[in-house]
């Protein structure tokens, strides 16, 4: 790209405070590119919780159009209303942004050299429990039902992202994190889908699996985590 447009979306609460300092850093590091017109920092307006509540839209149409004109989005935290709060019970704006822009991979690196930790997490970012937002079913006052959705194409593409990263960065294993011993269909299919991608296209990379509760409880256990490098997991985990 000859010119990169970075959309600036401060968000709610402490978001504008964080963004102010983030922009100080970005403007300093990219001052030459900004001066040369190769980088534009473009504010995106209309996305505060007050704006969204007034319009009754978690992701206003005009905001989405502004975002689509950008190459990169620098975003602060945005309020997702919870039952009992002053705001309407709207769907998460974060989730809608991800789905609208098809941002299916949340990539989270973790590096703690003194503990020999060099991990990269690939979280599927669109499906799972997040896919239906507030469209669950309140059967009675005592019974509510929400949904978990996991598709084969959704699993395959996040798996490919994880394996491609592993191969390009000299990693030798990918670990799948699920609760497939209990959530046997959605999580079971996710586990098998990742294994299939690995077996068919990345036979040089070892596939392991861990249960999400055990992984969380023992992330500080060097024996349990020894040798782990790249992780792939469904949305909620």
What are these model-derived regions, one by one?
Residues 7-24, 29, 140-213, 227:
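Glycine-rich phosphate/diphosphate-binding loop of Rossmann-like nucleotide-binding domains
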Residues 12-15, 71, 122, 162, ...:
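Buried hydrophobic positions in well-ordered alpha/beta secondary-structure cores of metabolic enzymes
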Residues 64-82, 204-237:
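Glycine-rich phosphate-binding loop
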Residues 7, 39, 72-73, 104-106, ...:
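Structural motif
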Residues 51-145, 236:
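N-terminal glycine-rich phosphate/adenylate-binding segment common to multiple enzyme folds
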């Amino acid at each position: 790209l000859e010119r990169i447009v970075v959309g600036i979306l401060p968000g709610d609460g402490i978001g504008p405070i964080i963004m102010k300092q983030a922009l100080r850093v970005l403007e300093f590091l990219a001052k030459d590119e900004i001066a040369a017109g190769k980088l534009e920092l473009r504010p995106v307006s209309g996305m505060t919780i007050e704006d969204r509540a007034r319009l009754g839209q978690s992701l206003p149409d005009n905001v989405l159009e502004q975002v689509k004109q950008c190459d990169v989005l620098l975003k602060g935290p945005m309020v997702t209303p919870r039952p009992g709060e002053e705001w309407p019970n709207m769907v998460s704006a974060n989730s809608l942004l991800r789905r609208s822009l098809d941002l299916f991979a949340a990539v989270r690196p973790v590096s703690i050299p003194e503990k020999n930790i060099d991990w990269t997490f690939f979280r599927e970012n669109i499906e799972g429990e997040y896919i239906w937002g507030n469209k669950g079913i309140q059967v009675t006052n005592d019974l509510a039902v929400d949904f978990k959705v996991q598709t084969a194409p959704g699993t395959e593409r996040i798996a490919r992202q994880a394996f491609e990263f592993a191969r390009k960065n000299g990693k030798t294993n990918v670990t799948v994190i699920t609760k497939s011993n209990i959530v046997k269909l959605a999580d079971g299919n996710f586990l098998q889908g990742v294994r299939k991608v690995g077996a068919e296209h990345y036979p040089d990379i070892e596939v392991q699996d861990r249960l999400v509760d055990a992984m969380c409880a023992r992330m500080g256990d060097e024996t349990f985590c020894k040798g782990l490098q790249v992780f792939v997991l469904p949305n909620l985990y």
